[in-house]
Amino acid sequence: MKLIIANRGAHDIGKTTAIKNVFANLYAKYAPTTTIYEPLNIADLAYNWVDVKATIKIGSTLVGIESQGDPGSRMQQSVDDFVAWGCEIILVACRNQGDTINTITNLESNHGYTVLWLQNGKCTDPACWQKLEEKYGNWIADIIEKCALTRTLSPTYL
């Protein structure tokens, strides 16, 4: 099974925050099988402007996580790295159009990945938005964990 989960959306909708929440959730369970490439100090993830690039081994499945998804970011290089390292599941942020979308569709057409396009919600109330991001991150982490452990993508996981 090869799966890429693309958290897409416009600038400042919370894509990076959601992916960092997914990472935190999975890291809490799988820290011994995690390799963090960015940032060099995990404590820096508490800052909004810091992105994460990491791999996590869940069962026998390697998962790649990249929270940078802006055009011109390291997203393309991270995806190339994840494919070269044998990641069967990749989670990335991306915009709604342009180079980041092209990177993902290339994985589908040239590397056999199934694409799961997702988009987090937004709320004008900050407390509501924070809770929404937390629940969304937990949901994605749950999908990743189930897919990794069963090595399948089932509609029941969604």
PLM feature spans:
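Glycine-rich phosphate-binding P-loop
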Residues: 3-27
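Active-site catalytic pocket residues across diverse enzymes, especially alpha/beta-hydrolases
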Residues: 26, 30, 108
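Conserved nucleotide-sensing/catalytic segment adjacent to the nucleotide-binding pocket
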Residues: 31-95, 101
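Short, glycine/charged-enriched secondary-structure capping and boundary segments
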Residues: 22, 80, 104-107
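Phosphate/oxyanion-binding active-site loops and adjacent basic polyanion-contact surfaces
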Residues: 15, 67-75, 132-140
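Glycine/serine-rich loop-strand microenvironments at binding/catalytic pocket rims
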Residues: 1-4, 114-116
